[in-house]
Amino acid sequence: MASPELASHHSDPSDGEGAPFLPGVDDESPESLNSDIPFQKHSNHGLIIKLFVIYLAIGMGGPMIQSPLTRIVESIACRNYWNAHDPSQLPGPEQISEGMCKIPEVQREVTTIIGYREFFNAFLTSTFALPYGLLADRYGRKLAIRLASVGFVFNSVLSFAPIWLPNIFPLRTMWFGAVGWVLGGGPVLLFALFWSMIADATADSERDTVILRFGIATVSAGFLANVTSSFVMKFDSRVPLMTGCGLLFAGLLVANLLPETLRKKSPETTISADTSVSLTSLFFRIKKTIWSYRFICYNYPVAVILPAFFVTQLAGGSAFLVQYISIRFHRTIADATLLVALQHAFTIPVLFFILPQISERLRAYISRLQSDLLLARISVMLLALGLFGIGLSSSINTLIPSLLLHAGGAGFVLIARGLITGLARREETARLYTLIEATQSIGEVTASLYITNSLNWGLGRGGLWIGLPWLIVSFLLALIALVLGILRLPPRSENASSGSTH
């Protein structure tokens, strides 16, 4: 993806605005560096492979945890409900059947527990990403990754204690697991670091391909994780839960082996930084960091595309969709997980075959950025139509086509990321990716509260009201499609992109 210099934005590295939240290799001027490593002109395939392994492990581990966790929480909440209201309905010490758990009283408790757990996780990881990003800026990325890894351990222990010891810890105490993100900043910082490293290690001419491959790897891993989880859950929900945790920690282990990519500054700069430890200097450093993001205000296309990363998060993750399918269509969580896995399966040819072929043909006639913009318009429309169908579906026969339609727009976030990267300058990439991750995290915070409360409201009324959360998001995505439809790229961006394409 080309990185044109926009006529409306000028940056002088000497005025301090180039100080990034999470700097890339190219984020600092050559004069301030004391390193014999040249600027990235060719892709660093060794680093890309390591990052690919990390994404594969995390991409399998995360989805593999979600459905078993929901089922275990549902089982415990269901047993607690019947113990309080009619103990004679309980089957004994063995696992309670899912059919007894689909009543609104139990599902509202499950939605509350899972939803607020997502809220606290997203809120704290978003809050602490900034200070730990400053730490990564000054002391390096390896230290930030190690602290985040310790935070993951604390999060896992505190989150899963109520599952393993339900007679000691109430289910809602799993919300305290979010405290683990106070140490290390959590997923927001990690993914900001990873995407920044990908940008550092990838040449401009290969960035689109690399981003697409990472997206394919994540979706493929999610599909395999959901299929495996759905099958194993029929026997024991705890097995895929622990397997997913193992994969997550394996990914973190590889992340701790990544090389340091923060460039060393000159001795004069280092001494100056070490002696500036007063509160006043810290305040101005934070102010300078925040001020460095003002390039968004001068880049109109970037400013109008950025909210799309927020809106796409409002649909919630697979955990909410699995629970919705299970409740609405009276399916087990394992069966609902399999339906979501089929949706993921369809996204693989969309990302791997359909989008690249369409993109290649389009670029024979229009520039790279124009092609990305057109594909983004089509993809977000498919997302909106798919969610509209999911929210209105009254049977599996109408749900499945809606899931496939939604899967057809699965490339939107990746396309939008590539588009917005091409509209920004090279030295703005690290800050832009951090801003994208923060925007998505804010979307996750909002989504967890929004879906939890709107789904509980819909459960109390039943019928089509249960699908209300997805209907509202489909309307917001339609607005994004309208904004992208009237968006026009700066002429200079189009020329720069066209020149780098051929």
UniProtKB/Swiss-Prot annotation:
Keywords, ordered alphabetically: Cell membrane, Glycoprotein, Membrane, Transmembrane, Transmembrane helix, Transport
Molecular functions per Gene Ontology: transmembrane transporter activity
Subcellular location per the Swiss-Prot or TrEMBL entry: Cell membrane
Family annotation (InterPro entries): MFS_trans_sf (IPR036259)
Matches recorded under CDD domains: MFS
Transmembrane segments: 45-65, 114-136, 150-170, 175-195, 214-234, 239-259, 302-322, 336-356, 380-400, 403-423, 464-484
Top-level taxonomic group: Eukaryota
Membrane-related topology note: Multi-pass membrane protein
Chief place where the protein resides: membrane
Sites where a glycan is attached: 495
Annotated region described as Disordered, given as residue ranges: 1-38
SUPFAM superfamilies (alphabetical): MFS general substrate transporter (SSF103473)
A GO CC term assigned to this protein in UniProt: plasma membrane
Function, in words: MFS-rype transporer; part of the gene cluster that mediates the biosynthesis of the asperipin-2a, a bicyclic peptide that possesses two macrocyclic ether rings consisting of 14- and 17-membered paracyclophans. AprT is likely to be involved in the cellular export of asperipin-2a.
Family, similarity comment: Belongs to the major facilitator superfamily.
Name the UniProt record assigns to this protein: MFS-type transporeter aprT
Organism: Aspergillus flavus (strain ATCC 200026 / FGSC A1120 / IAM 13836 / NRRL 3357 / JCM 12722 / SRRC 167)
